[in-house]
Every structure is written in structure tokens, then in C-alpha cells.
Amino acid sequence: MVNPADVPIEVSKVFDTILVLDFGSQYSHLITRRLREFNVYAEMLPCTQKISELTWKPKGIILSGGPYSVYEDGSPHVDHDIFKLNVPILGICYGMQELAWINGKGVARGDKREYGPATLNVEDSSCSLFKGVDHSQVWMSHGDKLHALPTGFKVVATSDNSPFAAISNEKENIFGIQFHPEVTHTKQGKVLLRNFAIDICQASNNWTMENFIDTEIARIQKLVGPTAEVIGAVSGGVDSTVGAKIMKEAIGDRFHAIYVDNGLMRLNETEQVYKTLTEGLGINLTVVDATDLFLGKLQGVTDPEKKRKIIGNNFIHVFEAEAAKIKPASGQEIEYLLQGTLYPDVIESISFKGPSQTIKTHHNVGGLLEDMKLKLIEPLRELFKDEVRHLGEIMGVPHDLVWRHPFPGPGLAIRVLGEVTREQLKIAREADNIFIEEIRKAGLYKDISQAFAALLPVKSVGVMGDQRTYEQVIALRAIETTDFMTADWFVFEAAFLKKTASRIVNEVDGVARVTYDITSKPPATVEWE
């Protein structure tokens, strides 16, 4: 058992860490994911990070790609203090050009752009970065290229359009590659990244959820102390449940969970959540039925952003009121608020591109901190979704809940397009239940990352028996993804869709037509609103 007094508050001080400096590439988060896949902890920070402000020393540094040109005014550049750390450095695409620019400025616009697959020709197989890597397909995505070899570097690999597709200065342990090893289109990309992290950086591959849980429990105990009380909102989803379970293991009944039933949940959801969290996991849970309040506030509202804000604001009011009723047996005041932040949320907030135009308002309990004067505790903020699931299984969270598809904070309010009424919710609930039921019967539930039925605000002509009908339309959506930052639509067999559509039209009153959404993310988001 880990002694709480011996555990640093920062995970990067516990595990060997590769630092990924993000220059704004759409692939930057994949670098972090790939490293963790072979149990090396990696953390992403913006390329503007001042090295002097780091409170920990990385085992190695990776400079990501980016949509800029190093020679243009206003382009981002890395803090040159990275070279004072004397750790291995790998530059990818823009990151390689940044290294070349710093070491001689030999970067210019290419004669032609190189996007897509290319054949990599390894010229120097003795390079430690390319151990086990041979001539193979790689993924290129660049318009600029090196036109001269930087001082102290040698050519390791070429492509038809890139005479400097890979370069190295092994004396200084600095490497540059023009292609993207983090994407699956680069056939031996994982081998290359593993060589860098484990062989060159000598990072320990001890980043496992088994090691994380002991460290995290001790970290929570150190942060919270022996007497402080913690509250947290739970939804029955894997993130909030695993977060609640960690708190239960760390501080026992000093953690108080609150479940707000807003009337926008899936079929029989509240009953299932209560049974799982109390009887199954022993969590101290309070359930609040606020259905009438939420549906009353949503009456007549059709704009999705307004719906989200109404739900978020009223959630805060209900949560605050219920939290005020909690009187810990210890006599202590509530000091901390549990929040289920995951690492993709962190990446989104620190990406070098910065906060972009608001696509959707995130439904969380951030507003509670200022209102309730609570300190935040986020036990899952270093984890990707798949890591949270693995952690849940280790901690004894029921398998069905661990692998349950995500459900949005605003619930069915953003799956009922247009005004939310009890009647519309009933249609959406029943259609969704049939869809998920058929997915489970087909043995596809675990193959699909998220699936749901959305009720559209349009009507369509149909025929039931000898009668003409004019009823609503259900849109089915199912996606595949590893991190929910990008997603592809799931390809069902036609027979499955035919059976599901038939059941929905015949069993759900008010539905005349069923469609299937075949849009990927991007350009679409997962949810319709």
C-alpha cells in the first residue's frame, strides 16, 4: 500500500513522463495515446510552455506537427531551454522543421505538397530510432520541407518528395521525422515511438491502471487529509461511477454522492443507477427527483444552446440545495467537489489552437466551485476513456456499467430536437431502448462506442394498415471511436437496420419513419444538438 505522505500531488512526478509539446496538429493527442498504449506515461502541453515553469523533468520531449510555417512571422516556436534539459528530443513534421530552423534555418516551401501515404526508404538502419523499422508506408501531411541538412545531423530516411524524411543527431539524441508515426496509416509508427520512449529515453513502462489506482488513492488521501468531506454529482455513467468508487476507496463515507433525476434520463435509468451505486458499490448516495422543475423550465424552448444552459443552471441550483442538506456525521464542512474531468477535456483546454468558437456548451459542474466556495478534486483528469474503463474493471465496477455507452449531461433534451415534452421524451426513450436492445442481441454493443436514437422535429407521411399516418421521424446514430475526438459511423448489416426500424415503427406510437445517420466526426458532432 502506498503511503499518502510519500506521494507527490503531480502524476508526472510519480511516473516517468514523455512531454509532448503541441503545435496545433490535429494528431497531437494521438502521440500521447500511442505512448500510453505501451505503458509509458505521456503528458501534452502547449508549445509555448516555459521549461523553467515545469515542476518535473521529462524523460524525453516530442515536438508535434502543426499547421504553420516556421519561417513566417507569428509562427510558434519552442522554448530553447528544452536543449538545456539534456533529454532526447523527437520532432514530428512541423516539429522536425522547428529543429531544423533552430539549427540552421534550412526550411522552405516545398515544390509540391505531400499529403497522404508515401513510401519511406530507410537509408541508415543503424539509427536507434529506426530499430526494427524498414521500408514501409508512412503518412505525410506537409507543404514545407527541409532544403538543407541542419548542422550536426545526418539523413536517416527519404521519400520520393522528401530527401530529408528522417534525420538524426545521435550524439545529442535529437531526431526529426517528416511523417506522422502516431497515425495508423504509418505502418510501423508504433515501433518507432516505442524505440524513442523506451530505448532512447529509457522511460519505464510502468504506466498501468493497477499502479495508478494505488498512487491515486494515496494522492487523494494526501490532498483531502483525514477529516475533509467531499461531495460529487453522479450520473450512472462510467466516468462519474469510477470517480465515485475511487473516492469511496480513498475516504469512505466522507464522500457524498448526489444523483439528480432531471426527467431526461433513459428508460429505467434512475432505478438502475441507485441499485448499482448503493447495493453494488456501497457508495453513500442521495437521489433527488427534479423532473417537474426541469421539464417546466424547458417548456417552449427549442434552441439547443438554451436547453443546455437551462439544464446546467438548474442542475447547479438543485445540487446546491441538496448539498446544503448534507450534514456529515463528523461535523466537518464540505470542502471538496468531485468532478469527472478526463484527459481529452484537458487537451481541449490547453491545445495551442486555444479556445475556438464555442461548438457546444459543456455540461459540467464547474459553476459550482465559485458558488459553493469548494476546492476541486479530479481523480480521472490524467486518463483517457479506455483507461477509465480498465480502471473501473480493476475496482470491481460491474462490467455492463464499465462498458456502457456515454450519455450526455443534458440527457434526452438534446436527443429530442425542438421542444422537450413528456410525450416527446417517451417516444425518444422507447425508440432508444429498442435500438440498444437490438444492438445487444446482435452482440455488437461492445464494438460500438456510442449509439442512440434521436427524435427529429419533422413529420413524415406513412401507411399503417389501410390508414394514412403523418408522424415523426427517428434518426439512429452509432459510432466507432477510441477517444471521442474523432469518430466514424458504424456499418450495420442491412438486415439489422431493417429489423430495428420495423420494431420502432410498429412498437413506438408516434413514429412513421426511421433513418440512419452516416456522418463522421468531423464534420458532424456525435450528438445532434
Curated annotation (Swiss-Prot):
Residues that bind XMP: 308, 466, 521, 527
Annotated organism of origin: Debaryomyces hansenii (strain ATCC 36239 / CBS 767 / BCRC 21394 / JCM 1990 / NBRC 0083 / IGC 2968)
Lineage: Eukaryota, Fungi, Dikarya, Ascomycota, Saccharomycotina
GO terms of biological process kind: GMP biosynthetic process
Principal location class: cytoplasm
Reactions it catalyzes: XMP + L-glutamine + ATP + H2O = GMP + L-glutamate + AMP + diphosphate + 2 H(+)
Assembly, per entry: Homodimer.
Function: Catalyzes the conversion of xanthine monophosphate (XMP) to GMP in the presence of glutamine and ATP through an adenyl-XMP intermediate.
Residues forming the catalytic site: 93, 180, 182
The Glutamine amidotransferase type-1 domain, residue ranges: 17-206
One Gene Ontology molecular-function label: ATP binding
Cofactor(s) required, per the database record: Mg(2+)
Record-listed E.C. numbers: 6.3.5.2
Domain GMPS ATP-PPase: residue ranges: 207-404
UniProt keyword terms in alphabetical order: ATP-binding, Cytoplasm, Glutamine amidotransferase, GMP biosynthesis, Ligase, Magnesium, Nucleotide-binding, Purine biosynthesis
A Pfam family matched in the record: NAD_synthase
A cellular component term, taken from the record's GO annotations: cytosol
Location in the cell: Cytoplasm, Cytosol
Name of this protein: GMP synthase [glutamine-hydrolyzing]
Positions contributing to ATP binding: 235-241
Pathway: Purine metabolism; GMP biosynthesis; GMP from XMP (L-Gln route): step 1/1
